[in-house]
Amino acid sequence: MKKTEKCYTNRELSWLQFNERVLNEAGNPRVPLAERMTFASIYQTNLDEFFMVRVGTLMMQMNAKEKVIENKTGMTSEEQVKEILARVCQLEKKKAKIYEQLMGELEPKGIRIINFNRLSNEEGRLLEQYFDAHIAPFLSPMVIGKQQPFPFLANKQLYAIVLLTSQKGKKKTGIVPCSNSVFKRLIEIPTRPGCFMLSEELILHFISKLYPKYTIREKSIMRVTRNADIDAHDLYDEDMDYRDMMEQLINCLLYTSPSPRD
């Protein structure tokens, strides 16, 4: 590394340091609780934007024919992405701890978000009825296999992902969009005022109802963050397998050579 390179901090890593300061405010007990919740939200919004714009560009540079080197620190795009992911992993662990602290401080004020396994049997039955009447009718479960095209997954949207086994033993993947303007994300427990459950957790718990002909092997919630420089939605054709479209898009990116970032 050149002597001049030691005088600079990589811009992307410096930005993460800034966002950590935002996160620190969310964990600062001297800051009012409502403001701390706002800081936690700002941290996540900032991180989404960072991955959509900054990391997205670095990923494109990694696929370029010519290696792109950041001219202040001499780091390649690949080195920057590696450092970014390692740092974000640390920040996300810190965020999880702060989130638990915030939830703990909200509880004495009469606001709680709980998991399904903490409900009584009667409460579970009430929420099952709520799911059947107010959520399930508005869900669009999909099954993806070798013969079905992979669907477009929208940016910053939640999806329930399940690994399925058919009655004939064939393995498939199920995808259920969880973001919907028809039902609320926060569902209040009828027997506990101020106590809420996230709609995606309710969907995941009862997801077997959406796939009655399959055995659920594994299930989880995922969220997609897309590169803001690529408008993949405009390129997508409903009759086209999204995997094929992405392959074509990557092949196109291989012929691009973005200039180094300042």
Tell me the role of every PLM-derived stretch:
Residues M1-T9:
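Charged, compositionally biased N-terminal leader segments and the immediate start
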Residues Y8-Q44:
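N-terminal-proximal low-complexity accessory segments that begin disordered
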Residues R11-W15, E35, Y43, T73-T76, ...:
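Secondary-structure capping and boundary motifs in well-ordered enzyme cores
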Residues V22, F39, Y255-D262:
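Conserved small/polar residues in nucleotide/adenosyl-binding loops
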Residues G27-R30, A40-F116:
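Extended, charge-enriched "interface" segments that sit outside catalytic cores
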Residues A34-E35, F51-G56, M60, I144-Q147, ...:
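Short, solvent-exposed secondary-structure capping/transition elements
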Residues K94-Q101, E105, R112-N115, L119-S257:
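Duplex nucleic acid-engaging cores and interfaces of nucleic-acid transaction enzymes
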